[in-house]
């Protein structure tokens, strides 16, 4: 036996493979205020006990590997390892369990969503012992929250910048999303803003294509914005999409937007990546720009109930990384979004403190310790008949965004914007007078139609448009 081997043996090293649960399943563990807590939906392979599956998740997302290694003796596993501290069966589902895992804070780099996700949702999602794995929720401890800047400005600062209070903000995505020239694009922006919208928006896949280069689009949109402001006396904005192939190019576009004096830029945070998003959020705070976030690609990650990452986790990650708005679903429109689940993560975006509430899918109490809030954006298949429900569901601190529901108006873009603004003002006034938007919404809209021909025309066009499909991601019974 060599001296090196003797040394390893003398400190208790024993080569081989042992069950994860012997080291990483610790039901007696008392979680600490500084731990990051995770709730995983685990579907083990046949024959794999839930305790072993939960322990495998804790191990493979922290300090463990598939075999014992002698370098374990050079550090303190008890200090750094993840621990599966509770497992509960999912009622109504065969062979599904919620495994709760606690991670010591020292495992993660300060201020880095990228590093946090690389550990927690890294290679473990391809682990053969698991048929499926989904991250349902995270508890981010205040000690870690305080290492993040978060949103560039937040809800109250945005309202102060725009001088708009007491109602949801109104937006519109310019359509068709691809193919317009920069000048025609700017014309559509002007008409929508002149008609009464607060914002217009680049679609998520508008970057810098041959039919419309980014610099031309920025210039024509800025011209439209300033012209609409001069005519209406209101502050207007257009979400200029700064997403690009490199971080350097993205920041260059944001710099040009700042030089034009516009109030807001945009980023596709999942396709662009968390490192790029955090970099842009820091630039926006330093330079007075609001930051609108689109969640393109989210459904690839979050839509399947038994595998992936729930959007409430992606929403928390965005609040940490930085963004002033983020698309959150509509409940009533064309995109996925069950009401209780949606309102659960909307509260996680906006509120300072959110209590655990399993009836809304919230597994952990979350204290954001004064991290600025994010405005949820309802967008996708909505029109004037949805306005009462949207106002009632999302409240004042939200952005209601009508793309086709503005540009599809039979009289044009500006009348479409007028229709939406009138519908919103009618709903807000009715709510403030004590009327029930959920019960009287259609009546409120019909009353407003009597003095707004633009709204009456919109109501006639979309009176039979509904999207009656069951949500895929629903709460456990």
Curated annotation (Swiss-Prot):
Residues with PTM N-acetylproline: 3
Gene3D superfamilies per record: Ribulose bisphosphate carboxylase, large subunit, C-terminal domain (3.20.20.110), RuBisCO large subunit, N-terminal domain (3.30.70.150)
Acetylation found in the keyword field: yes
Location(s) in or outside the cell: Plastid, Chloroplast
Residue(s) at site: Transition state stabilizer: 334
EC numbers, comma separated: 4.1.1.39
Active site: 175 (proton acceptor), 294 (proton acceptor)
Cofactor entry: Mg(2+)
Catalytic activity: 2 (2R)-3-phosphoglycerate + 2 H(+) = D-ribulose 1,5-bisphosphate + CO2 + H2O; D-ribulose 1,5-bisphosphate + O2 = 2-phosphoglycolate + (2R)-3-phosphoglycerate + 2 H(+)
Highest taxon of source: Eukaryota
PTM section of the record: The disulfide bond which can form in the large chain dimeric partners within the hexadecamer appears to be associated with oxidative stress and protein turnover.
InterPro entries reported in the protein's UniProt record: RuBisCO (IPR033966), RuBisCo_large_chain_AS (IPR020878), RuBisCO_lsu_C (IPR000685), RuBisCO_lsu_C_sf (IPR036376), RuBisCO_lsu_fd_N (IPR017443), RuBisCO_lsu_N_sf (IPR036422), RuBisCO_lsuI (IPR020888)
Cofactor, how bound (note): Binds 1 Mg(2+) ion per subunit.
Pfam families: RuBisCO_large, RuBisCO_large_N
Listed GO CC annotations: chloroplast
GO molecular function: magnesium ion binding; monooxygenase activity; ribulose-bisphosphate carboxylase activity
Main location: plastid
Binding site for Mg(2+): 201, 203-204
One GO BP: photorespiration
Function field: RuBisCO catalyzes two reactions: the carboxylation of D-ribulose 1,5-bisphosphate, the primary event in carbon dioxide fixation, as well as the oxidative fragmentation of the pentose substrate in the photorespiration process. Both reactions occur simultaneously and in competition at the same active site.
Note: The basic functional RuBisCO is composed of a large chain homodimer in a 'head-to-tail' conformation. In form I RuBisCO this homodimer is arranged in a barrel-like tetramer with the small subunits forming a tetrameric 'cap' on each end of the 'barrel'.
Oligomeric form and interacting partners: Heterohexadecamer of 8 large chains and 8 small chains; disulfide-linked. The disulfide link is formed within the large subunit homodimers.
Protein's name according to its UniProt entry: Ribulose bisphosphate carboxylase large chain
Species annotation: Nicotiana tomentosiformis (Tobacco)
Phylogenetic lineage: Eukaryota, Viridiplantae, Streptophyta, Embryophyta, Tracheophyta
């Amino acid at each position: 036996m060599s001296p090196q081997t003797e040394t390893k043996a003398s400190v208790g090293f024993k080569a081989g493979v042992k069950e994860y649960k012997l080291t990483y399943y610790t039901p007696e563990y008392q979680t600490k205020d500084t731990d990051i807590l995770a709730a995983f939906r685990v579907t083990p392979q046949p024959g794999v006990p839930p305790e072993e599956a939960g322990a495998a998740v804790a191990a493979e997302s922290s300090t463990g590997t598939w075999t014992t290694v002698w370098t374990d003796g050079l550090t303190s596993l008890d200090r750094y390892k993840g621990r599966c501290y509770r497992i509960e069966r999912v009622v109504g589902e065969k062979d599904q369990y919620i495994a709760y895992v606690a991670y010591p804070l020292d495992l993660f780099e300060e201020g880095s969503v990228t590093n946090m996700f690389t550990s927690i949702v890294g290679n473990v999602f391809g682990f053969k012992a698991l048929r499926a794995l989904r991250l349902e929720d995270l508890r981010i401890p205040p000690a870690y929250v305080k290492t993040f800047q978060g949103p560039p400005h937040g809800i109250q600062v945005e309202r102060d910048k725009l001088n708009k209070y007491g109602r949801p903000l109104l937006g519109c995505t310019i359509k068709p999303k691809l193919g317009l020239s920069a000048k025609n694009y700017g014309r559509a922006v002007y008409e929508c803003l002149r008609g009464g919208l607060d914002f217009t928006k680049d679609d998520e896949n508008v970057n810098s294509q041959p039919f419309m280069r980014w610099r031309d689009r920025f210039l024509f949109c800025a011209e439209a914005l300033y012209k609409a402001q001069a005519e209406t006396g209101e502050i207007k904005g257009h979400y200029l999409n700064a997403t690009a192939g490199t971080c350097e190019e993205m920041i260059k576009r944001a710099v040009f937007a700042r030089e034009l004096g516009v109030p807001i830029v945009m980023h596709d945070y999942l396709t662009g990546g968390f490192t790029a998003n955090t970099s842009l959020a820091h630039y926006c705070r330093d330079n007075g720009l609001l930051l609108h976030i689109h969640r393109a690609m989210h459904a690839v990650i979050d839509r399947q109930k038994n595998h992936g990452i729930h959007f409430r986790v992606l929403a928390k990650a965005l609040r940490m990384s930085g963004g002033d708005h983020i698309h959150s679903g509509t409940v009533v429109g064309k995109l996925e979004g069950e009401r209780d689940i949606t309102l659960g993560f909307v509260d996680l975006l906006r509120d300072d403190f959110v209590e655990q509430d399993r009836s809304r899918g919230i597994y952990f109490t979350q204290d954001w310790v004064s991290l600025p809030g994010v405005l949820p954006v309802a967008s996708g298949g909505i029109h004037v008949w949805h306005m009462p429900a949207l106002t009632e569901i999302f409240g004042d601190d939200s952005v209601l965004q009508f793309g086709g529901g503005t540009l599809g108006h039979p009289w044009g873009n500006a009348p479409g914007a007028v229709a939406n603004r009138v519908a919103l003002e009618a709903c807000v006034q009715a709510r403030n007078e004590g009327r029930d938007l959920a019960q009287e919404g259609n009546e409120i809209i019909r009353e407003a139609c009597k003095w707004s021909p633009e709204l009456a025309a919109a109501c006639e066009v979309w009176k039979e448009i509904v999207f009656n499909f069951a949500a895929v991601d629903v709460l456990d019974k």
